[in-house]
């Protein structure tokens, strides 16, 4: 894995007796899109707020770009959108970013580059209050892009958007990663994370349950076989792949984690005298994996 730009070790946040974030150990590699996945109230936003120095951890440590959260060296290298964008409704999109750029000592080129990259250059002089929700979210990302930071931390950037707005935001995030930004993206939208993220951390009730690539999290693909009669086909399949790999389900025979066995399985079923109705690769969705992991939480 590439060098880590975000590292936490035992990161914990307590509010009285309530533990909002519990011993989280995460790694975000430079250049990747990292999906921080969990249901509402899982501890995602609290974790992000600790990473940017907005709140102090109760225990544990975090480093961002090699420094403690909130350090001046970190502030210059990260762009943040947490809990929705906040702008002056009576100012234009351009003027809102101009206020932020001036505060940070940035010039006109930075401002115009940010507007262009989020696709708002042609609407930049419209008042913020006239923007659609999707445009407001994109302006928020534009604000995070001021100064071309190495790391973007985006908290639920598609929350509340319609399907078109969600698609546009996914395209934008993918393009930003292609331009060399690392993106730490929190979301409860499983399909969104599966589609654009390189690696995923799954959090539930404050605990980080898993951290891996999307492919690793979903696991090896399986085969699904339907045949008649099943009482003939099932023993034939087990004879090829073994008892543990073949599972009889309501939808057919699921063959887990045995690559390259499809031809042999098909022959065995037919030779046993059963009619082979269907044999296809069946991959678990991230949604299925997520619910399996969090159902006991």
Task: List where the protein language model places each region.
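ABC transporter nucleotide-binding domains
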Residues: 2-8, 13-204, 208-210
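Generic structural signal for individual residues within well-ordered alpha-helical segments
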Residues: 75, 97-98, 112, 167, ...
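Non-catalytic alpha-helical coupling and interface elements of nucleotide-dependent molecular machines
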Residues: 102-105, 242, 295-296
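Short low-complexity, flexible loop/linker segments enriched in glycine and/or proline
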Residues: 201, 292-295
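Conserved beta-strand-loop-alpha-helix hinge in the C-terminal portion
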Residues: 207-228
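Short, charged/small-residue-rich alpha-helical element at the C-terminal edge
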Residues: 222-293
């Amino acid at each position: 894995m590439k060098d880590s730009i975000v590292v936490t070790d035992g990161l914990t946040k307590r509010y009285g007796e309530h533990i909002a974030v519990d011993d989280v150990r995460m790694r975000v590699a430079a250049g990747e899109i990292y999906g921080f996945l969990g249901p509402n109230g899982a501890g995602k936003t609290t974790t992000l707020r600790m990473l940017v120095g907005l709140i102090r951890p109760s225990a544990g440590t975090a480093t961002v770009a090699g420094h403690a959260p909130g350090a001046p060296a970190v502030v210059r290298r990260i762009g943040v959108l947490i809990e929705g964008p906040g702008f002056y409704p009576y100012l234009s999109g351009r003027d809102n970013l101009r206020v932020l750029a001036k505060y940070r000592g940035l010039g006109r080129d930075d401002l115009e580059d940010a507007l262009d990259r989020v696709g708002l250059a042609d609407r930049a002089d419209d008042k913020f209050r006239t923007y659609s929700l999707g445009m407001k979210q994109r302006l928020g990302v534009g604000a995070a892009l001021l100064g071309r930071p190495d790391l973007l931390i985006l908290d639920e950037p598609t929350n509340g958007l319609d399907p078109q707005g969600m698609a546009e935001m996914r395209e934008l995030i993918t393009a930003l990663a292609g331009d060399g930004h690392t993106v730490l993206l929190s979301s409860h939208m499983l399909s969104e994370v599966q589609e654009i993220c390189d690696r995923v951390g799954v959090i539930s009730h404050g605990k980080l349950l898993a951290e891996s690539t999307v492919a690793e999290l979903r696991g090896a693909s399986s085969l699904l076989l339907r045949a008649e009669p099943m009482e003939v086909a099932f023993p034939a399949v087990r004879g090829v792949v073994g008892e543990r790999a073949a599972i009889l389900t309501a939808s057919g025979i699921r063959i887990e984690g045995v690559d390259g066995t499809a031809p042999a399985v098909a022959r065995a079923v037919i030779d046993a005298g059963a009619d082979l109705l269907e044999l296809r690769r069946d991959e678990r969705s991230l949604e299925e994996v997520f619910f399996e992991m969090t159902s006991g939480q």
